[in-house]
Amino acid sequence: MAAMPKPSDSKTGGKATVLLGSQWGDEGKGKLADVLSGQMDVCARCAGGNNAGHTIVADVNGVKTKFDFHLLPSGLVNPRCAGFIGSGVVVHVPSFFAELDTIQKKGLNCDGRLFISDRAHLVFDFHQVVDGLKEVELGGSSIGTTKKGIGPAYSSKASRSGLRVHHLYDPELFATKFRKLVEGRFKRYGHFEYDTEGEIARYRAFAERLRPHIVDGVTFIHTALAQNRKVLVEGANALFLDIDFGTYPFVTSSSTSIGGVLTGLGIPPTAIGDVIGVMKAYTTRVGMGPFPTELHEEIGHHLQEVGAEYGVTTGRRRRCGWLDLVMMRYSCLINGYTSLNLTKLDVLDQLKEIKICVGYVVDGKELPSFPADLEVLAKVEVQYKTLPGWQQDISKTTTWEELPENCRNYVDFIEQFLGVKIEWIGVGPARESMIHRAG
């Protein structure tokens, strides 16, 4: 084990670039992660598990190849970039190996460059069973989880009964704690079918295969920063799925805001450099919960089809609506974005008029901020600003100046309302379909 590095000097040590979802997820973070990872030495995950979903098309030996990332950092598409799964992530080991095997079969060699913190908690198959049982129990009030066991694993962690990666290397302790953990779930949900002893044996085998990937996560990330390595932190999910600041209870079970970066990796605020918020040019969400700007008719269906709005992880159809700047202003306050990446702007190409939410009104009074109470959110009257569309294909544009005037006006309005520069603009699904506004 390497010696513990000295604390990073905020003036001379490296700074991590952080990439965060600013809405309800599915904003297209993977594409910018792919673009930025070409300049990075480390791409790190800090929270969540294999409930995330990033799709990237990369060149592998001269062939355009599609990769779906769920648990692994998508920066692995850059052959010189190390992938790191931090302490705040919950790891389902079978999914880790299945995903690793899949991307390696597609020609992406990850030998010696994929690491997991020894403090990360483990997700087991019984967590996934419990996830489904809990959704059934909730009935019509179900949250609409991915049923990947993420919530139950974080529940085990919070109740201090969970198992961490390092426990795999004390077989007797692992077996004892595992049996106790499963028994607790039997008492809560009844005796569901589960091979406890078979699972213990399976994880004993996993432990040996996993061993080359295990590191002291705190030492790993601080060494990278102390050596001025370029670190990209790839956020999972998004601000409105955050356990504290999202549309609770229709959220995930981890901190998906900037705070989760610090606690999930064990780094101080002084180690953070740029914080890039990724936002769609419209709004989508998966699952249940209020959605003020949701479109149910023709335009909503148009956004769904043209934007291919189906979840990477679940395949579920995403709900679509107009861009909500009340949401985005709240998101900017919490995460402190230094710049924004506006994605899928081309999906709006055919629309004659485009609406943007600029305010919420309840009982004749404008709300001063995004409400915590979902009962209030469900009854807001949305105030819209209507802008003319550009009604032409922008997917081949490569510079800001090439965009139609009405398109630039749309971007400018968002930027001025939020007070944050839109530095990156996605105009198509390809990696190259990204305009960078430098300066």
UniProtKB/Swiss-Prot annotation:
Q: What is this protein called?
A: Adenylosuccinate synthetase
Its quaternary structure?
Homodimer.
Record's cofactor remark: Binds 1 Mg(2+) ion per subunit.
Q: Name one GO cellular component term.
A: cytoplasm
What species is this protein from? Mycosarcoma maydis (Corn smut fungus)
Sorted alphabetically, which SMART domains does this protein's record hold?
Adenylsucc_synt
Q: Where does substrate bind?
A: 312-318
Signal peptide segment: none
Q: What is its main location?
A: cytoplasm
Please give the NCBIfam families that the UniProt record associates with this protein. Answer: PRK01117.1, purA
Required cofactor names: Mg(2+)
Binding-site positions, Mg(2+): 26, 53
Q: Where is the active site?
A: 26, 54
Q: Which InterPro entries match?
A: Adenylosuccin_syn_GTP-bd, Adenylosuccin_syn_Lys_AS, Adenylosuccinate_synth_dom1, Adenylosuccinate_synth_dom2, Adenylosuccinate_synth_dom3, Adenylosuccinate_synthetase, P-loop_NTPase
Binding-site list for GTP: 25-31, 53-55, 318, 344-346, 426-428
The protein's location, in the record's own words, is: Cytoplasm
- List its EC numbers: 6.3.4.4
